[in-house]
């Protein structure tokens, strides 16, 4: 279920303030955040946000195609190890 339009997208206040400061100064700097549930809004385009995945911060460069998605979608929390292949062992008789 999507969020109500009258509420608008959720963006953490501290994250929004940091991005607005950097936009005013014109500085490109990595912004560290734990807020995986924040929605990407158009003022974030061109910034790099380091999103916490539970163990470390993953740098995510924001492009225009990412607008409307959540930050957590781009910092995967689980590492997939490939399944082991079946080895047919033929025994000699």
Curated annotation (Swiss-Prot):
Q: SUPFAM superfamilies per the record?
A: Ribosomal protein S19
The molecular function terms in GO held by this entry are: rRNA binding; structural constituent of ribosome
Q: What are the subcellular locations of this protein?
A: Plastid, Chloroplast
Question: Do you know which InterPro entries this protein is assigned to?
Answer: Ribosomal_uS19 (IPR002222), Ribosomal_uS19_bac-type (IPR005732), Ribosomal_uS19_CS (IPR020934), Ribosomal_uS19_SF (IPR023575)
Matches recorded under Pfam families: Ribosomal_S19 (PF00203)
Record's GO cellular component terms: chloroplast; mitochondrial small ribosomal subunit
GO annotation, biological process: ribosomal small subunit assembly; translation
Annotated membrane-spanning segments are none
Q: Plastid: present as a keyword of the record?
A: yes
Arranged from A to Z, the UniProt key words for this protein are: Chloroplast, Plastid, Ribonucleoprotein, Ribosomal protein, RNA-binding, rRNA-binding
Organism superkingdom? Eukaryota
Gene3D superfamilies named in the record: 30s Ribosomal Protein S19, Chain A
Q: What does this protein do?
A: Protein S19 forms a complex with S13 that binds strongly to the 16S ribosomal RNA.
User: Sorted alphabetically, which PANTHER family does this protein's record hold?
Assistant: RIBOSOMAL PROTEIN S19P FAMILY MEMBER, SMALL RIBOSOMAL SUBUNIT PROTEIN US19M
Q: Which family does it belong to?
A: Belongs to the universal ribosomal protein uS19 family.
Q: Which NCBIfam families match?
A: rpsS_bact (TIGR01050)
Which named protein is this? Small ribosomal subunit protein uS19c
Whichever gene encodes this chain, its name is rps19
């Amino acid at each position: 279920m999507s969020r109500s339009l009258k509420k608008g997208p959720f963006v953490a206040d501290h994250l929004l303030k940091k991005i607005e400061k950097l936009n005013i100064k014109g500085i490109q700097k990595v912004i560290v955040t734990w807020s995986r549930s924040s929605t990407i809004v158009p003022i974030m385009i061109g910034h790099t946000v380091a999103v916490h995945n539970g163990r470390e911060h993953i740098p995510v460069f924001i492009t225009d195609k990412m607008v409307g998605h959540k930050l957590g979608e781009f910092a995967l929390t689980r590492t997939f190890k490939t399944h082991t292949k079946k080895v047919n062992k033929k025994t000699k008789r």
